[in-house]
């Protein structure tokens, strides 16, 4: 093999190897930051992974919010009207957090089936609902009746 061709081949091989390593590291880094969305029906059915960071969303079940008087711990249930999931959160809740309102919580599901949230997001006006929550409610039994709130939420997709 001619020395110039050998040198070019070596350079090309190093470039291909470098690009492959960069793509592999980027894919690994992005995989660590993906938070998949699960609705309460999927979580209750056991389809959500345990001890993996996920997002769970739905409506805060009426009468389910209980606050610890000595700390910032809050327990509540998130429902899609077909199933509900208990959620534990320690921290300051958003001002718009209320029973009967839409929320998206980020955290991990423990072995007992309790979603331990480290972040809770509440909707920002009376018509908005996160698209994932609107879809989950639409798929649930109440969603088959197409309530006016779910229809409005499905139309409003701006964050």
UniProtKB/Swiss-Prot annotation:
Any one cellular component term from GO for this entry? plasma membrane
Q: What is its main location?
A: membrane
Q: Where is heme annotated to bind?
A: 124, 128
Cytoplasmic-facing ranges: 1-8
Subcellular location(s) of the protein: Cell inner membrane
Q: Does Transmembrane appear among the keywords?
A: yes
Report the protein name in the record. Answer: Cytochrome c-type biogenesis protein CcmE
Q: Which organism is it from?
A: Marinobacter nauticus (strain ATCC 700491 / DSM 11845 / VT8) (Marinobacter aquaeolei)
């Amino acid at each position: 093999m001619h020395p110039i061709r050998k040198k070019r081949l070596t350079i090309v091989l190093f470039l291909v190897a470098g690009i492959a390593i960069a793509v592999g590291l980027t894919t690994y880094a992005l995989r660590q930051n993906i938070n998949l969305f699960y609705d309460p029906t999927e979580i209750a059915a056991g389809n959500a992974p345990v001890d993996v960071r996920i997002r769970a969303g739905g409506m805060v079940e009426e009468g389910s919010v209980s606050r610890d008087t000595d700390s910032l711990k809050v327990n509540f249930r998130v429902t899609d009207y077909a199933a509900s999931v208990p959620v534990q959160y320690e921290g300051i809740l958003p001002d718009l957090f209320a029973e009967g309102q839409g929320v998206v919580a980020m955290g991990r599901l423990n072995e007992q089936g309790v979603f331990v949230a480290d972040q809770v997001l509440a909707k920002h006006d009376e018509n908005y609902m996160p698209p994932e929550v609107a879809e989950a409610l639409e798929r649930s039994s109440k969603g088959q009746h197409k309530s006016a709130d779910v229809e409005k939420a499905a139309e409003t997709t701006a964050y």
